[in-house]
Curated annotation (Swiss-Prot):
<dbReference type="InterPro" id="IPR036290">
    <property type="entry name" value="Phe_ZIP_sf"/>
</dbReference>
<dbReference type="GO" id="GO:0005068">
    <property type="term" value="F:transmembrane receptor protein tyrosine kinase adaptor activity"/>
</dbReference>
<dbReference type="GO" id="GO:0019221">
    <property type="term" value="P:cytokine-mediated signaling pathway"/>
</dbReference>
<feature type="domain" description="SH2">
    <location>
        <begin position="409"/>
        <end position="507"/>
    </location>
</feature>
<feature type="region of interest" description="Disordered">
    <location>
        <begin position="507"/>
        <end position="528"/>
    </location>
</feature>
<dbReference type="Pfam" id="PF00169">
    <property type="entry name" value="PH"/>
</dbReference>
<keyword id="KW-1003">Cell membrane</keyword>
<feature type="modified residue" description="Phosphoserine">
    <location>
        <position position="130"/>
    </location>
</feature>
<dbReference type="GO" id="GO:0042169">
    <property type="term" value="F:SH2 domain binding"/>
</dbReference>
<keyword id="KW-0963">Cytoplasm</keyword>
<dbReference type="GO" id="GO:0001725">
    <property type="term" value="C:stress fiber"/>
</dbReference>
<dbReference type="GO" id="GO:0051649">
    <property type="term" value="P:establishment of localization in cell"/>
</dbReference>
<feature type="region of interest" description="Disordered">
    <location>
        <begin position="549"/>
        <end position="611"/>
    </location>
</feature>
<dbReference type="InterPro" id="IPR001849">
    <property type="entry name" value="PH_domain"/>
</dbReference>
<dbReference type="GO" id="GO:0005884">
    <property type="term" value="C:actin filament"/>
</dbReference>
<dbReference type="GO" id="GO:0019222">
    <property type="term" value="P:regulation of metabolic process"/>
</dbReference>
<dbReference type="GO" id="GO:0001726">
    <property type="term" value="C:ruffle"/>
</dbReference>
Length: 621
């Protein structure tokens, strides 16, 4: 009776084709590997060669055989002591092997081989990524064991072998879920930097700073957040070590020389929880570019509909990203009434404070050609070296010294970071957009900041006593000749080679240009220096203005009064600075503070005889 049961059960049971089984799983593995192979070539185009498919498939097949053999050996070794062959499995596999190979084996050998094939099939299915095929194989085993009289024992025997598969599939689903969560939607910027936590300097050996290499990623997150800043340590790590939402950043600024005396290209991030990160870039351009990008993502101004609200928010952000300019803070503390500037075809309303320098505000971009045409139609710029008496020369120099701040492309003591933000507002589309500002580090010099293919470049300008402009190895008779030249000829970059960068347009300084009127020596006396009229240009206070004499005098009187050192209201000689140069930030700060207190003290000897410290080499910095 016991011997007849297996034979009667084996007759109706369908015998699966092992070749079809192998072909099915081979197709699944091949399709999965082909998809991943194509994705790999898209991510790494250097491997995209005509024979890449052959090389990859051969390597895949060789490794597949090695891993397959090892996995079979491992599964058989772990399951040999726990699993015993069932009579039904023995009979079915015996019929399968007899029909396939035609060998005559004993029932014990066939049962052992059937258990091996069962484990091999399960082990092979675990290597595939398709869960539907795994479920299909499971249904196949259930159908084979269903005709057995004691079929309740067969599923129990198959459970220990299916548990590892279920655990593996659960891990596979979990890994896919995590990968979907960390998928990036919009990467703003990515680069390799070095960073340290501010507290690590004291905790390191001997109080030294603990710098770490990282991959800094500025991205937009998935779940409705705006932006995040992530530190990947080491740079090749797949998950960030530190992840900071930009809404938690309260301050972004470049470091001062006293803070990091041994490092030049560093900036600071301060977070709401009190953490402070110091990051180091390769050069100064990357430093200011990172600061500008982070600030732009912290509070993008284009999301504000109300201009007044945008200006107010920009004022808060300007205090966060304050540069090392002491004049910036002093001037920001002085309240100024808002003014409305009406230009040709454009109306811009903004307060006079430094909050206008934020990227979010809509600043007018004026074509340089329009300015040059206006300049030519007005007869050009008056020469400063006309013959005349000394008093007339001094008055002409004083008038010319105010001219640079009167032009719309000059932004006074605008910081390097804010200048970069202005020219980078349109990204690569604003190629050729420029501003001219006063140098933060070299008194008496100016800097041409322009947009070069979406990156901010800073070119130093030097103005001599005759108004001539020196840019790298080129000399120009005036700043206007320099603008006219670089409007039609490419700017020679320090990196060499041909660069298609010409000055196309400029960011117009927000402030009404002064109305043409009498020269400063014929203006009505004002009570103190640096007290400007209501309609004066915003940046005119950044140039050097002198107090008019107490009583009107002619040119000779002006000459004699300029030679007298006892008069506090006389015009001080400035042999070391040109008529078109802008003065240092520290000097202008002193005058601002004096104006606030209402004092009119005599200029010190150091102020009168300030000389240029270094003969400049004109390059990007």
């Amino acid at each position: 009776m016991n011997g007849a049961t297996p034979s009667s059960a084996a007759a109706p049971a369908p015998v699966p084709d092992w070749r079809q089984f192998c072909e099915l799983h081979a197709q699944v593995a091949a399709v999965d590997f082909a998809h991943k192979f194509c994705r790999f070539l898209r991510d790494n185009p250097t491997y995209d060669t005509p024979d890449a498919g052959t090389s990859f498939s051969r390597h895949f097949a060789a490794n597949f055989l090695a891993v397959f053999s090892e996995e079979v050996r491992r599964v058989l070794g772990s399951a040999a002591d726990t699993m015993e062959p069932e009579p039904a499995v023995t009979s079915v596999t015996s019929a399968l092997k007899t029909a396939t190979y035609g060998h005559s084996r004993s029932s014990e050998d066939v049962s052992a081989h059937a258990a091996t094939k069962a484990r091999v099939r399960k082990g092979f299915s675990l290597r595939n990524m398709s869960l539907c095929v795994v479920d299909g194989v499971r249904d196949l085993w259930h159908r084979r064991s269903s005709p057995e009289p004691d079929g309740g024992a067969t599923p129990k025997a198959a459970e220990p072998a299916s548990e590892p598969r279920d655990k593996w599939t659960r891990r596979l689903r979990l890994a896919r879920t995590l990968a979907a969560k960390v998928e990036l939607v919009d990467i703003q910027r990515e680069g390799a930097l070095r960073f340290m936590v501010a507290d690590d300097a004291a905790s390191g050996p001997g109080g030294t700073a603990q710098w770490q290499k990282c991959r800094l990623l500025l991205r937009r997150a998935v779940a409705g957040e705006r932006f995040r800043l992530e530190f990947f340590v080491p740079p090749k790590a797949s998950r960030p070590k530190v992840s900071i939402p930009l809404s938690a950043i309260i301050e972004v600024r470049t470091t001062m020389p006293l803070e990091m005396p041994e490092k030049d290209n560093t900036f600071v991030l301060k977070v709401e929880n009190g953490a402070e990160y110091i990051l180091e870039t390769i050069d100064s351009l990357q430093k200011h570019s990172w600061v500008a990008d982070i600030q732009g993502c912290v509070d993008p101004g284009d999301s504000e509909e109300d201009t007044g609200l945008s200006c107010a928010r920009g004022g808060c952000l300007a205090s966060r990203v304050a540069s090392c300019s002491c004049e910036l803070l002093t001037d920001a503390d002085m309240p100024r009434p808002p003014e409305t500037t009406t230009a040709v075809g454009a109306v811009v309303t903004a307060p006079h404070g430094r909050a206008r320098d934020t990227v979010g505000e809509s600043l007018a971009h004026v074509p340089l050609e329009t300015f040059l045409q206006t300049l030519e139609s007005s007869g050009g710029v008056s020469e400063n070296n006309n013959p005349g008496d000394e008093g007339a020369e001094l008055d002409t120099d004083a008038e010319a010294e105010l001219e640079l701040s009167d032009y719309p492309w000059f932004h006074g003591t605008l910081s390097r970071v804010k200048a970069a933000q202005l020219v980078l507002a349109g990204g690569p589309r604003s190629h050729g957009l420029f501003v001219i500002r006063q140098s933060e580090t070299r008194p008496g010099e100016c800097v041409l900041t322009f947009n070069f293919q979406g990156k901010a470049k800073h070119l130093r300008l030097s103005l001599n006593g005759h108004g001539q402009c020196h840019v790298q190895h080129l000399w120009f008779q005036s700043v206007f000749d320099m603008l006219r030249h670089f409007h039609t000829h490419p700017i020679p970059l320090e990196s060499g080679g041909s660069a298609d960068i010409t000055l196309r347009s400029y960011v117009r300084a927000q402030g009404p240009p002064p109305d043409p009127g009498p020269a400063p020596n014929t203006a009505a006396p004002v009570p103190a220096c640096w007290t400007e009229p209501a309609g004066q240009h915003y940046f005119s206070s950044l140039a050097t203005a002198t107090c008019p004499p107490a009583s009107p005098s002619n040119g000779a009187g002006a000459s004699s009064s300029s030679g007298s050192s006892s008069s506090a209201t006389s015009l001080p000689p400035r042999p070391a600075e040109g008529p078109l140069s802008a003065h240092s930030r520290s000097n202008s700060t002193e005058h601002l503070l004096d104006a606030a207190s209402g004092a009119t003290e005599e200029p010190t000897e150091a102020t009168l005889g300030r000389a240029r410290a270094v003969e400049n080499q004109y390059s990007f910095y």
